[in-house]
Structures are given as C-alpha cells and as structure tokens.
From Swiss-Prot:
It is a peripheral membrane protein. Keywords: ATP synthesis, ATP-binding, Cell inner membrane, Cell membrane, CF(1), Hydrogen ion transport, Ion transport, Membrane, Nucleotide-binding, Translocase, Transport. It comes from Paracidovorax citrulli (strain AAC00-1). InterPro entries: AAA+_ATPase, ATP-synt_VA_C, ATP_synth_F1_bsu, ATPase_a/bsu_AS, ATPase_alpha/beta_chains, ATPase_F1/V1/A1_a/bsu_N, ATPase_F1/V1/A1_a/bsu_N_sf, ATPase_F1/V1/A1_a/bsu_nucl-bd. Produces ATP from ADP in the presence of a proton gradient across the membrane. The catalytic sites are hosted primarily by the beta subunits. Belongs to the ATPase alpha/beta chains family. ATP binds at residues 158-165. This is ATP synthase subunit beta. One of its GO terms (molecular function) is ATP hydrolysis activity. F-type ATPases have 2 components, CF(1) - the catalytic core - and CF(0) - the membrane proton channel. CF(1) has five subunits: alpha(3), beta(3), gamma(1), delta(1), epsilon(1). CF(0) has three main subunits: a(1), b(2) and c(9-12). The alpha and beta chains form an alternating ring which encloses part of the gamma chain. CF(1) is attached to CF(0) by a central stalk formed by the gamma and epsilon chains, while a peripheral stalk is formed by the delta and b chains. It catalyses: ATP + H2O + 4 H(+)(in) = ADP + phosphate + 5 H(+)(out). GO terms for cellular component: plasma membrane; proton-transporting ATP synthase complex. Its EC number is 7.1.2.2.
Length: 476
C-alpha cells in the first residue's frame, strides 16, 4: 500500500505559501499531500526540503536542508515520493559528502549505484549480537579504567577545550589505522577546520588512498556548524546509514561522531522553528525519542558490528544537563574529561573516578585487570578525600599510611598522562601506544609500592613503567 502511495504522489507539484527562516510551508492538492519525511525538490534549484508536519488543507511544513536565501511565495516544489536517499557502499570510501550524499571534496560525483534511505528502523531484537571482546586503544587510562568493547558504544564527555576532539583523533589514529575493517566519520556541527585537518591526516596515513579512492578505509560526512539546522540534524543519520550498509555486508565498522551534542542542539532549533513547546532547559520535548531513534540504530547484528565512538559536549561542565544525561543511558563506556585534571597539565584529562565501563568486570577483563583498576581507583579516591585535610593542616598531620596513599595517588595521576601521536606538534614528544599488558603491569607495580622510591615527576608523560624508571635516573 505504501508503495502505491509513493507512486501516486511522486512528481506531484505544490507551491511555497510561507517561508520563515529554515521553515517552509508548501501547499499541495488536498488528496495528494506528501508523507512525513518525504523529500521535496525546489524547481530550478538544488535545495531539498524535508516534510516534518502535515498542517491540513493540503499544506505541509518542511525544513530546508540548505540555505533558504532567495526563497519566495509562489515558487514551485515537486514531491520525490521518497525520504532522503544517499549513496552507500564502496562508492563512498575516501569521499567527503554532505547530508544529501553530494560530494564536497571536488573529486567528481559519487556513484548512485547503491542508495539507501536515511530513515530506517533499528534492527529487530533477535538480530542483535552482544559483544564481550575488548578493543585495545593504546591509551593507558582508557584501557585500564573504562575499557571499550568491540561492537560497543563509547561516549567522550567534556566541556569546551578539555580535549574531546584530540582524544577522538588519537583513538582514530590508534584504532582506525590498525583496524582491518572500515570507518565512517560523521562531523555534526563542528568546525570546518577540524574536518579539513582530519581529511588531510587520514590522507597522510594512507587511510584515505588519494590515488585509488575505492581502496580507502574511511567515508566522511560533514555538516559543519555554519550549516542550517536541518543539515546538522540529519547529517548523523546520513553517516549512520553508510555505516549500516557496510555492517549489513558483514564488515566490522568504526563509526565516529563529533559531536553528538550538536545533533541535539540542531533538534532544539528545528523544534523551536516548528513551534513545539520547549521542555527542560529549552530542549525539544522529543529529546529522548530523537536520541533513542539514532542510538538504537548504532548496534551490532549477527552479520557485522558497529563500534561507535561519540564526542559529547557538556554545556557549562554540567553532566546533569538533559542532553548529556540522555546520551549516558545508551552507552557501554563513558570517558569523562575533567577540567580540574586538565588544569594540572595532565593529558588525556580523563577522570578515572567518573569514567565507567560495563566491560570492567572480572568475567570480561580478567581478575588481575579488574583488581588493578579498582586498586588505582581506590587510591585516587582516598587522595580525593584527604585533599581538604591537606589544604587546612598540611601533609605533616597525616598518618603514615595516608602519606603513602597520597604519594602513590600522585604517581598514579601522573602515570595516567601520556604523549599522543596527534599532539606531537604541540608537545614536542613522540606519541606512545601502550599495550594493555604493559598498562596493567605498570599500575600494578605502583599500587603494590614497587615504585615508592621514584620521584613523582618521573611518571609524567611517559608510556610504559620502564620509561618511568629511565626518566627517574635522568631526574636523579
């Protein structure tokens, strides 16, 4: 029945009756109104409109997926009869596309041989496949305290300027380059410069093969922050559709989203433009439903897996804000970046007490890893509790065992720092990839007291524990 409708309504023409910013009302014959989410094309223009509401009397309310400059009442619009469809499959590899799947890298058109609608249902419950396999990142603090699962969902939470994008770039560097599968990067409402830097970095490392694009390992979809809200709202779905198509071919896919908060923000803008009543803190009333619809599609099936890493901006460093709070519920691992840790000069500024992972379970990571991680967290928690006493009375008033706990905690804190490959330009020190076994060995030695004789500065910005011993000799 839906197919018949599509055939009847495709090609039907309507005319613009109202245009307020990105919201455009179009009037169609009453018996041939487009369906919600149908894509409409403006005559003589590349602009696409997406139907959001049916107002009655043949009028539909749409969101413009592009600039609405120059629109006026009376312009003719035709119904495509289908939702927005984008190219998928091998043709997208090595390319940069916009929300509609059009190329923006000046390397010719993208083949439309395989296309898919950006609006799809999440896989059925019986198709899903849980994963217990760990994904090693080479970043000590993440591998130890909040390990990632292959086929899991990870969130990088942080306020402005604490290192979400740098952490994500390092994860891409460590995982995507060594990863045998494919990657999809969705830039949602972020800076154009970051998208440009990412593309050139991928080209330099060979992940994007400029000589033979189809041999590339990454597809990129960008809707940067100067785009209209409709583009920023849908660009995550475009990226996800490409990732789903690779997964359904039986591949293991890495799906990077930077930044999921901008997706929420675009939803807020669209909701306000459509005249919906705002909910808490001005967010759209459909916040949980919109987030759920996106996140439920990012999942692994029995055919292939999607491992997703999402940066989440935290407004005013408030993790209880409705947007990050709604995102938390969908994730397997949460990496929380802290401004307090960044202010100490410790990068990556991951808070080991706030970050969590469902994989940190002795049955998944093993007893040794679990005990070391909990030992590290216990020592850091004790230091946190003693800080007020130290501030008022000083270190001398502490009991001997507390002095020892503080000394070890400060060493752990510094050992959690690590030079990144992507930050070599800024730090001047070569990046370090630390295998999980080395990470566990190093922290086990500190917690057990085998490094009590070393100065704490020996642990700052090193890779393995052996490097800390080497650095201690130079310091001494």
């Amino acid at each position: 029945m839906a197919q018949e409708n599509t055939q009847v309504n495709a090609g039907v023409q309507g005319k613009i009756v109202q245009c307020i910013g990105a919201v455009v009302d179009v009037e169609f014959p009453r018996d041939q109104m487009p369906k919600v989410y149908d894509a409409l094309k403006l005559e003589g223009s590349p602009l696409t409109l997406e139907v959001q509401q049916q107002l009655g009397d043949g009028v539909v309310r749409t969101i413009a997926l592009g600039s609405s400059d120059g629109l006026r009442r009376g312009l003719m619009v035709s119904n495509t009869g289908n939702p927005i469809t984008v190219p998928v499959g091998k043709a997208t590899l090595g390319r940069i596309m916009d929300v509609l799947g059009s190329p923006i890298d000046e390397r010719g058109p993208v083949s439309q041989e395989l296309t898919a609608s950006i609006h799809r249902k999440a896989p059925a419950y019986d198709e899903l496949s849980p994963s217990q396999e760990l994904l090693e990142t080479g970043i000590k603090v993440i591998d130890l305290v909040c390990p990632f699962a292959k086929g899991g969902k990870v969130g990088l939470f942080g306020g402005a300027g604490v290192g979400k994008t740098v952490n994500m770039m390092e994860l891409i560097n460590n995982i995507a380059k060594a990863h045998s599968g494919l990657s999809v990067f969705a830039g949602v409402g972020e800076r154009t410069r970051e998208g440009n830097d990412f593309y050139h970095e991928m080209a330099d490392s060979g992940v994007v093969n400029l000589e033979k694009l189809e041999d590339s390992k990454v597809a990129m979809v960008y809707g940067q922050m100067n785009e209209p809200p409709g583009n920023r709202l849908r660009v995550a779905l475009t990226g996800l559709t490409i990732a789903e198509s690779f997964r359904d071919e039986g591949r293991d896919v890495l799906f990077f989203v930077d930044n999921i908060y901008r997706y929420t923000l675009a939803g807020t803008e669209v909701s306000a433009l459509l005249g919906r009543m705002p909910s808490a803190v001005g967010y759209q009333p459909t916040l949980a439903e919109e987030m759920g619809r996106l996140q439920e599609r990012i999942t692994s099936t029995k055919v292939g897996s999607i491992t997703s890493i999402q940066a989440v901006y935290v407004p005013a460093d408030d993790l209880t804000d409705p947007s990050p709070a709604t995102t938390f519920a969908h994730l397997d691992s949460t990496v929380v970046l802290s401004r307090d840790i960044a202010s100490l000069g410790i990068y990556p500024a991951v808070d080991p007490l706030d970050s969590t992972s469902r994989q940190l379970d002795p049955q998944v990571v093993g007893e040794e890893h679990y005990q070391v991680a909990r030992g590290v967290q216990g020592t850091l928690q004790r230091y946190k509790e003693l800080r007020d006493i130290i501030a008022i009375l000083g270190m001398d008033e502490l009991a001997p065992e507390d002095k020892l706990a503080v000394a070890r905690a400060r060493k752990i804190q510094r050992f959690l720092s690590q030079p990144f490959h992507v930050a070599e330009v800024f730090t001047g020190s070569p990046g370090k990839y630390v295998p999980l076994a080395e990470t566990i060995r190093g922290f086990k030695m500190i917690v057990a007291g085998e490094c009590d004789h070393l100065p704490e500065q020996a642990f700052y910005m090193v890779g393995t524990i052996d490097e800390a011993f080497e650095k201690a000799k130079k310091v001494a």
